[in-house]
Every structure is written in C-alpha cells, then in structure tokens.
Regions:
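Two-component system phosphorelay core
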Residues: 1-140
Length: 140
C-alpha cells in the first residue's frame, strides 16, 4: 500500500462485537472503553452518545474538506476522530483515522481506498453504537 499503513482488518479478530457475535471482529471494544472511565457505565454511555453525534458532523465536514482539497482540515478532523475513537475503544476506526491523518503529510499519494476504508469503518462504528445504546444499561 502506498501509505505504508494497513487498512485491512488485523490478522486475528479483536474479539466479539457488542452484539455478541463471536465471528464478527470487534468494531469498538466496550471493555477498553470502560477501562478508560474506571468502569463507570453511565459515564461511558454518555461519552459514546456524544461520540456518535460528533461523528456525524465530523464525517460530513471531512467530506467537504476532501472535496475542497483542504488537506490541513482533513488532517485536523482525522486527528479529532482518532482521539475520540481511542476514547471509546474503536481501535479500527482509530487506526483508519491515523492512516488518513498520516496521508495528509503527502496528500498527492492519498488513495481513494484509504478514504473509503475510513468511511466504511466510521459507518460500522455508528451502527454498532446504535446497537450498544439500544441495550439496557448493565448489558454491555
């Protein structure tokens, strides 16, 4: 790959999804996310809910920045997403955002598949968050 950052899934699954499907790679790691907030489920749910709202805006902003070839804003938005994804345990999205941010160091090498992989992962996280937030508190 041109950027030297892998956009494929890791060689081994990260674990179960929040829906408990053991065959599906983990989209976001609730255990890791809960660790970041000392196991406070209520606080974690608030953070995840806020992340979900922000990601819609960030995704739309990123599309505009890409369209206008505003590479600094692409890098800044990717950096923001990377940090937020890390906070909730969305490791694959964090990696995709990091790859997109790094690609902005030489945007002429940016490949469409890099952008597509980022938006696919963002959509997967948003879908998984929806399922997570539909669960009654205590079932995460």
């Amino acid at each position: 790959e041109t950027l030297g950052v892998h956009s494929e899934s890791p060689a081994r699954p990260l674990g179960q999804s929040v829906r408990g499907d053991s065959a599906a790679p983990k989209v976001f790691d609730t255990v890791a996310g809960l660790r970041r907030v000392d196991g406070d489920v209520s606080l974690y749910r608030k953070i995840v809910r806020l992340f979900s709202k922000e990601m819609v805006d960030d995704g739309e902003q990123l599309k505009v920045h890409l369209l206008h070839r505003d590479w600094k804003q692409v890098a800044d938005t990717a950096h923001k997403v990377k940090g937020s994804a890390s906070t909730i345990g969305a490791q694959r999205l964090e990696a995709e955002a990091k790859g997109l941010q790094q690609a902005m160091k030489s945007p002429e090498t940016l490949r469409e598949d890099r952008v597509d992989a980022f938006f696919r992962e963002l959509s997967a996280v948003q879908e998984e968050i929806s399922h997570f937030l539909d669960l009654p508190e205590g079932h995460q």
